[in-house]
Amino acid sequence: MSKGKFYITTPIYYPSDKLHIGHTYCTVATDAIARYKRLCGYDVMFLTGTDEHGQKIEEKAEAAGVTPKQFVDNIVEGPGGARALWKLMNISNDRFIRTTDDYHVEAVQRIFKKMYEKGDIYKGKYSGMYCTPCESFWTESQLVDGKCPDCGREVHYAEEEAYFFRLSKYAEPVRELLLSGTFLEPASRVNEMIKNFIDPGLEDLCVSRTSFTWGIPVDFDPGHVVYVWVDALFNYCTALGFLNDKYDDYDQYWPADVHMVGKEIVRFHSIIWPAMLMSMGMPLPKKVFGHGWLLLGGGKMSKSKGNVVDPVVLAERYGVDALRYYLLREFPLGSDGNFSNELLISRINTDLANDLGNLLSRTVAMVIKYFGGTLPAEREHDALDDELIAMASSLRETYAGYMDNFGTQQALIEVFKVISRANKYIDETAPWILAKDESKRARLATVLYNLLETLRITVTLLLPFMPDSCVKAFAQIGAAPEQTTWDNAAVWGVLPADVTVHKGETLFPRIDMTKELAELEALKAAKKAAAAPKSAPVLPDVTIDEFAKCDMRVCKVLKCEPVKKSDKLLCFTLDDGSGTDRQILSGIAKYYRPEELVGKTVVAILNLPPRKMMGMASNGMLLSAEKDGKLNLLMLDDSVPAGAQLC
C-alpha cells in the first residue's frame, strides 16, 4: 500500500554545452532520494529536463552554423547528450521535459497571459546591466566589482521594451514563506535570501525580451519572447499536465515535495517562483533544497570557463555505482566540496573494495568453502553476536532519519559503520579456526549467517545509491526480492536458515592509485592536445612591394542575399567608399544568415580580377578566418569609414 505521493525535481539544465559532473551530482542526489522514497513505499514522480531557450543558445547555435533547435537537439538527444548521460548514470526519472516541447510552449503562453490579465504582468521599458551567460539583469548595486554577482563575468548595458512581473507586490508574503523555517534548506540560505534580496527591496522582474528571438513568443505581442523566469520555472507544473493535454496528473502530484537545485539558483526558486505561483493562485512547493557546488581547484566548475569534469570518462573507468557512491559519500549535500581524482580513487579503494567488497567476497567464499554454498540449519549463539545484530537491526531507523532530511552523506556513513563492524566480527569470531573443529559446525554456520544477514540489511539500504551493484550482491548472498524490502530492512533473520550463496564477480576491484593518476594525466594531456587549434602552415615570404599590391579596404554591407541554386554563396552589395556599389560573392552561407550581415563593417581585397560565380560577377574577395572548419568574417568597428585602406 502506498504511503502517499512524493514529487521531486532537479532543475532543468541549460544545454549550452555537454553536461558535466556538477549536473551529475545534483541529478544523482535527486535520484537517490527518489529511489529511497520508492523503497519506502511512496508513489514517486521524479522529473528532470532541459531549459532550452535564450540568447546564449541562440548565439552558440549561430556560431556553430545551425539553428537553435538543431543545436539543443544535439546536446539533449545526440550522442553523449543529456538523455544518454542520465541513462548511463542509471537515473530513474519518470519524466523528462524539454522547454521546446509543444505542450510546454502552449501552457507557458497561457500562464503568461493569465498573469497579464490579472495585472501582475505589465508592459514597460528596461534599462540596466545584463549578463549574457547567466541571462540575468542586474542593478548597479547588485554588481560585484562591476561584474555579474553570480558568475563574475562582464556585463553590458541593455535597453529594450519589455514586460515586467510585479515581484515587488509579493515581497512580504515571500518573506513570511522564507521565515516559516520549512520552505528553504539549508537554513543558511534563508538568511542569504532575506539579507541580499528581500531587505534591499524586491524590484519588478523583466519577463520578456525583444533583443533575441529564440524563445516562446508572447502570443498577444509577437515581438516579445517569454523570458526564462516564466518559461523555465513553470516546467515543474506543465510536466504534470497543467494547462495542457499532454499529461493529467497535476492534481495527483502537485505541489512538489522538494525542488533540488544548485545554490546559484536558490534565489529564483525561493523568491521568484513562489511569487509567480501566488500570482497564479497555485499551491506552493513544500521545500526547496539548495545543494552546494562541486569545486575544482577551489573554484566553481563552469561550462563557459571550460574547467569541467566529464562524468562519462569517470563512469566508464570506475563504474557508474562507484561514481554515484563517491559523489554522495564525499560531500554533504548542503555544502561545497572539492572534487579530485585522488579522493575518488581513495573512496573506491577504502569503502567499496576494502570494506563492502571484502565483506561480501569473504563471506560468500567461506560459505562455499566450508559448506558447499548452502548453510546448515543448526545454530549456536554467542555473546559476540549481540553487538552486530543490534547495530544491523537498528540501522534502518537511523538511516531513515538522515535520508528524510537529505543527509545522504551521513546515511552512508551509518551504513558503513555496520559494514566495518561486520568485518571486525570476522576477525573476532575467526571462522577459519571454527572450520577446523567439527563440533563447532553450528557455531560456524551462525557466524556466516550473521554476516549474510548484515549484508542483506546494509545492501538493501545502499539500493538508492548503487542500484546495479546491490542487485548483484543480493544474487551472491542468495537474497530474494521479497527479502530485500524496506520493511524487512528492519527485521533480523529474514534469510532462510539454509540459504544458498553464489560466487559472483568482484564488484569493486582495487585501483592502483599511482598508476591510475598517471594514466588520467596522460588522458588529460592527450585531450588538451587534440583540442588545440591547428594552425595553417606558414606560407613562403613575400616582399613588402608584393604585399603592397593588394588593395585591402574597409567596406560597409548595404545588402546581403543568398545566391539562387547555391547553398554556399552569399551575394554582397558593398559601399567601398568609391561612390559606386561593389558586388562580391563569398562562400559563407553555411555560417551566417544574410540579414545579420547587413550594416556590418568588413574588409575586402578590391583589385582582384572579376570572377564569374553561378553566372554572377564577383569583384573582389572578403577576408575571413577559419576556425574548427567554420569561416568567420573579418569585421571592424563601425566607426571606421568605408574606403579606409588597411595599412
Task: Show the residue positions of the predicted features.
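N-terminal catalytic cores of NTP/NDP-binding nucleotidyl/phosphoryl-transfer enzymes
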Residues: S2-F71, I97-F112, E117, C134, ...
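Helix-rich, typically C-terminal accessory recognition domains appended to large enzymatic cores
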Residues: K123, E330, S335, L343-H381, ...
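A broadly conserved sequence feature marking short terminus-proximal activation segments
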Residues: F71-Y130
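Hydrophobic, well-ordered secondary-structure elements that form the walls
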Residues: G298, V415, L451, P467-S469, ...
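Phosphate-backbone binding interfaces of nucleic-acid-interacting proteins
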Residues: K528-C647
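Intrinsic disorder at enzyme termini
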Residues: A473-E546
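Cys/His-rich short segments
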Residues: K118-A171, R175
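Structured secondary-structure scaffolds
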Residues: M1-T48, Y103-A107, C151, Y157-K369, ...
